[in-house]
């Protein structure tokens, strides 16, 4: 039985929260974030003023909603930064839509997390999940066992990953 608050029905954590959380987790400078965003496609870039708007809280003056394309470039840049670029393969197209499942998948790839690592990350955040729950998150959207990753699940994953990375 799946607790109703563990999986969402369409709700997605705002991109700005994800960007801020990963930036804090890895202690990235503004310049490094900008560099990661342009890493998958040097023709795509943002400037410091845009990043400042993305990093503000929703209720702060100057807040700018981080679009899916920006977060997708950032996550792909993070994967390339952590894993390197495979010159034998053509570049992967950047995701057009980013939801919590995509964020989870990109972070899993970037940090080379196996199932056991994923379970540890969730447990370290005080939010253990079962094997069937986890496998449902990584299924294709049309699959009968696919589940959307809810905000609570993603927040706890980011919290656990931050504890692991920062050693806090």
Q: Language model features by range: what are they?
A:
Residues 13-20, 29-66, 91, 127-150:
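A cross-kingdom feature marking solvent-exposed beta-strand/loop segments within repeated
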Residues 18-23, 33-37, 68-81, 103-108, ...:
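Short, structured motif recognition centered on aromatic/hydrophobic residues
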Residues 57, 61, 77-84, 113, ...:
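Amphipathic alpha-helical interaction surfaces
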Residues 22-27, 98-129, 133, 141-144:
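Surface-exposed interaction/gating patches
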Residues 11, 73-100, 168:
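Intrinsic disorder/low-complexity detector
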Residues 146-168:
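Short, Lys/Arg-rich amphipathic alpha-helical interaction segments
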Residues 7, 45-48, 74, 78, ...:
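Membrane-targeting and insertion segments and their boundary/processing signals
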Residues 1-12:
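Short, Lys/Arg-enriched N-terminal segments with co-localized hydrophobic residues
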